[in-house]
Amino acid sequence: MHRIFLITVALALLTASPASAITPPPIDPGALPPDVTGPDQPTEQRVLCASPTTLPGSGFHDPPWSNTYLGVADAHKFATGAGVTVAVIDTGVDASPRVPAEPGGDFVDQAGNGLSDCDAHGTLTASIIAGRPAPTDGFVGVAPDARLLSLRQTSEAFEPVGSQANPNDPNATPAAGSIRSLARAVVHAANLGVGVINISEAACYKVSRPIDETSLGASIDYAVNVKGVVVVVAAGNTGGDCVQNPAPDPSTPGDPRGWNNVQTVVTPAWYAPLVLSVGGIGQTGMPSSFSMHGPWVDVAAPAENIVALGDTGEPVNALQGREGPVPIAGTSFAAAYVSGLAALLRQRFPDLTPAQIIHRITATARHPGGGVDDLVGAGVIDAVAALTWDIPPGPASAPYNVRRLPPPVVEPGPDRRPITAVALVAVGLTLALGLGALARRALSRR
């Protein structure tokens, strides 16, 4: 009871912020984008598809460390995700008997259906969420009986037709995937009747140079408050536009989460508590050095030395880097573990609202010493505790400012490019490959 009280008190700070500090933008439901699949503009494939691999000497007979750390096997005594549908908004999924994803739509290729992963990313996240077991190895997803829908929303392999690559700045090269298309993908997934949406992507921009993301905010509000979907998002990885945020200033006790110190906004992560924002940890339980900090981080989960299922349905633990295979890592995969847990909870507690599912995950997390911080939020998730603890359900809806807003005014001038362009990254891909040049440029809604 003492632990629950500490978490409940600390969670009040997750959404509290000084009036003078930066806060997530108010949501305008009137900015909801249409439910239309397809890319923002015609695209073409420019790069060969990537495939995951394995590190030398790897063995997969035992469960991955992350499953053991989170108690996944014990959690399956209470729920397996049966009857729950999870939408994976990512780079697509290569379906296999062990990752039996179904087509949910394609926002990269007009002729696609979501069941193609040229980036070796969406398949990995989907397998962590709901990969099926096999007698040949110890891998199993968090919610192995959940239904998977794949929505391909971004890809490094595709670019707008006629776009020109910049050999001196690959980050400036247009690629498929934008905040506009992400917003449409969220609406489409919600309308397909899913119970959980996983978004292992992040866009970062400076506080001093905000972007127009009204369509994304409206789509998240629609998914959560209208369609009743739990939306889980990655906190993001450092690199490129994602410059690490400083720690809260201890001399300002009125700002315990450090809203006044935020320098880099991460979206859609900063829409917490409407979404569940997930940071990363390593095998020691310490926060991952690459995991973006912020007052919006809600919980954490494993993000290093990840084992998943590849395009053939076999275990993998590496991606090809410049100098050979490198371990799979990133907050993408931390988010996938939490989405799997959300699916278990939706099966076990079908009457709980999205806000109450999120409350159960955060209230039962292994909280840090101070109860909550900007690295791991309320702490590392505890699957069995979330499924079994007797705790109050919490408020039916998350406190969030939803109101109709006037159209945003974009000031012309020398800073116009930073205002209208951000990097939308599948958070895990860039880090794992060790190639900063893989960060994609994506236009926000003007």
Swiss-Prot record:
Induction: Constitutively expressed during growth in culture. Induced during growth in macrophages. Residues 1-21 form the signal peptide. InterPro entries: Peptidase_S8/S53_dom, Peptidase_S8/S53_dom_sf, Peptidase_S8_subtilisin-rel, T7SS_pept_S8A_mycosin. Residues 64-387 form the Peptidase S8 domain. It comes from the Bacteria. This is Mycosin-1. May play a dual role in regulation of ESX-1 secretion and virulence. Acts as a protease that cleaves EspB. Essential for ESX-1 function, required for early replication in macrophages and full virulence in mice. Disruption phenotype: Deletion mutant fails to secrete EsxA and EspB and replicates poorly in mice. PROSITE patterns: SUBTILASE. Coiled coil: none annotated. GO terms for molecular function: serine-type endopeptidase activity. It holds the Pfam family Peptidase_S8. Belongs to the peptidase S8 family. The keyword Cell membrane applies. Residues 24-43 are annotated as: Disordered. GO terms for biological process: protein processing; proteolysis; regulation of secretion; symbiont-mediated perturbation of host process. The gene is mycP1. It is a single-pass membrane protein. The active site is at residues 90, 121, 332. One of its GO terms (cellular component) is plasma membrane. Gene3D superfamilies: Peptidase S8/S53 domain. The chain crosses the membrane at residues 419-439. Keywords: Cell membrane, Hydrolase, Membrane, Protease, Serine protease, Signal, Transmembrane, Transmembrane helix. It is found in: Cell membrane.
